[in-house]
């Protein structure tokens, strides 16, 4: 969704790019006190694999990150990555946002449409109006 959907283009389009003037709307600025948000998702590990959760395995970098942030102790996961990803991205039960099964598989029934419903909203969509930007690395 565009950040400024109703704002008219204020640049100039001419016969060539060189003679044209690009334009971008001014971005919303986050207040200086706005915290950074970093979500790190690990694949195929359990909470007992990290030192910050009491494991004897040494994980100093993860432990330092954990000491400066939040540690979750109760997150429901399923045996499928699509459903867990939907819950993580929205903060809601995966059925309630339309991903009760594999992504891109639409069963034709509510809760099993195979994609996150537009009206569900993701964390990134909820933070965008507050000047947050997101970036994802990985699979």
Regions from the PLM with identified roles:
Residues 1-139:
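Formylglycine-dependent sulfatase
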């Amino acid at each position: 969704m565009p950040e400024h959907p109703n704002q008219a283009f204020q640049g100039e389009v001419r016969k060539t790019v060189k003679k044209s003037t690009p334009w971008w709307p001014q971005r919303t600025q986050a207040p200086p006190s706005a915290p950074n948000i970093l979500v790190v998702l690990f694949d195929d590990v359990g909470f007992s694999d990290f030192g910050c959760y009491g494991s004897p395995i040494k994980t100093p970098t993860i432990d330092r990150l954990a000491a400066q942030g939040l540690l979750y102790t109760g997150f429901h996961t399923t045996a499928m990555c699509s459903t867990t990803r939907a819950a993580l991205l929205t903060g809601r039960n995966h059925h309630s946002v339309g991903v009760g099964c594999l992504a891109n598989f639409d069963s034709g029934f509510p809760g099993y449409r195979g994609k996150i419903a537009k009206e569900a909203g993701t964390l990134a969509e909820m933070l965008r109006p507050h000047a947050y930007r997101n970036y994802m690395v990985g699979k």
